[in-house]
């Protein structure tokens, strides 16, 4: 028997839905790629009010764009993230795009078990720009790799140098959590 997920999961396309339904008893809302509009936002808002919504978009530029648009309009939605290597096609005949449709059951289950939501208590946020510089996220030859590693480890997605502080604040990540996550960075 498939595990039931009570929230509606927002995905980009039909193949994402097919893969999720292969393993879970779940309802999805498809944005049809990056072509999200005001009607989509209104529908997602209604779904969120009735069932709750998990945004589970591809770990690429368009997926992050869709996620930001939804997060701006509906800050209380939840988020699930796949690591980039979990979204790579397993077969060369499937193309080179990243997507939820390529993820294994274990990777999907892990991502959905670690759903996060936007953090609303900014006063408790304890990370500064100087902390990010000290930890090598904003300056240095491997700063991009460090940010990628952090985003994957904390399952908050990739952020560029300008967005990292805001992303950490949105998800209520503490300095201690960042330092702990980076202990295993090699």
From Swiss-Prot:
Swiss-Prot/TrEMBL cofactor(s) = Mg(2+)
Cite the cofactor comment. Answer: Binds two Mg(2+) per subunit.
The subcellular location is: Cytoplasm
Tell me the InterPro entries matching this sequence: RNase_M5 (IPR004466), RNase_M5_C (IPR025156), TOPRIM_dom (IPR006171), TOPRIM_RNase_M5-like (IPR034141)
What GO MF annotations does this protein's record show?
A: metal ion binding; ribonuclease M5 activity; rRNA binding
List the PROSITE patterns hit by this protein, alphabetically: TOPRIM
Residues annotated as binding Mg(2+) 1 are: 12, 58
Catalytic activity reads: Endonucleolytic cleavage of RNA, removing 21 and 42 nucleotides, respectively, from the 5'- and 3'-termini of a 5S-rRNA precursor
The primary location reported for this protein is cytoplasm
Per the record, GO CC terms?
Answer: cytoplasm
Q: Per UniProt, where does Mg(2+) 2 bind?
A: 58, 60
Where does the Toprim domain lie? Answer: 6-89
Q: Name one GO biological process term.
A: rRNA processing
Keyword Nuclease carried by entry? yes
HAMAP family from the UniProt entry: RNase_M5
Family, per entry: Belongs to the ribonuclease M5 family.
Report the protein name in the record: Ribonuclease M5
Where does this protein come from, organism-wise?
A: Streptococcus pneumoniae (strain ATCC BAA-255 / R6)
């Amino acid at each position: 028997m498939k595990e039931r997920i009570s929230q509606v999961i927002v995905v980009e396309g039909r193949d994402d839905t097919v893969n999720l339904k292969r393993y879970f008893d779940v309802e999805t809302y498809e944005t049809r790629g990056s072509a999200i509009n005001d009607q989509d936002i209104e529908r997602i808002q209604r779904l969120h009010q009735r069932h709750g919504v998990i945004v589970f978009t591809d770990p690429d530029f368009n997926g992050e764009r869709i996620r930001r648009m939804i997060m701006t309009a509906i800050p209380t939605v939840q988020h699930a993230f796949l690591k980039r290597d979990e979204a790579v096609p397993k077969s060369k005949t499937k193309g080179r795009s990243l997507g939820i449709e390529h993820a294994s059951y274990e990777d999907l289950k892990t991502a959905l078990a670690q759903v996060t939501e936007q953090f609303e208590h900014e006063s408790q946020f304890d990370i500064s720009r100087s902390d990010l510089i000290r930890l090598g996220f904003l300056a240095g030859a491997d700063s991009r790799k460090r940010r990628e590693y952090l985003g994957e480890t904390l399952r908050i997605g990739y952020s560029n140098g300008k967005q990292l502080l805001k992303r950490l604040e949105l998800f209520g990540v503490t300095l201690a959590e960042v330092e702990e996550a980076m202990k295993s960075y090699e």
